[in-house]
Amino acid sequence: HVLLVGAGAERFARIMGCEEGDLETELSKKVYQAFIDDAFDDEGVIDESQNWVVKYARSQNLREWFDKLADEHHGTVNIMALDANGDIASAVSTSGTALKFPGRLGDSPIIGAGNYCDNRYGAAACTGRGELAIRNSTARTIIHYLENGLNPEEAAFLAMKDIHDLNGVGGMNCIVLDNKGNTISATTTPERDSVYWYFDVDMTEAEQRAGINVQK
């Protein structure tokens, strides 16, 4: 099997002993409630870190869609590993984009878009506007760049340049691991620092490392 969804995926996760959890946070619930109440402009409701949600909701006219649907019903985690045998794994979890249309599928479960790994070359995973990664097959493209002799930073740089070339709405981030254990992260978002966490067998705790910011 390559892809499991819905009840089957939930059943498999339980069999594998995965812990169930609530993806909602107090902040995400506060922002969502502000959207429901049309209270983005109320003082103290939205802090600066969530301004992107307000901009997105307004630019995409989500209030109109919400009023039509009236259906009451946040981040992505990327993990990659290289073991002593040279086996490489990548995993992505996501709660999807905020205020999405029912049925919308992002890049995380799409092998080649949101994540990809190949023992011969390395692994890559993405977070950001999933539609952009799907259009570019970003994770697979990064591995293709590694296959053609680029190092992780060069591969990440070109992949983020490819995202800019789409001229789409939203940004993209990625992390890259090659088959030698070299790592890097990258982002297309101007106001964001690209960082990731690294850990190996010689370390007692994980360390935060700086990635690169790629602009047009």
Locations of regions flagged by a protein language model:
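N-terminal nucleophile
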Residues: 1-216
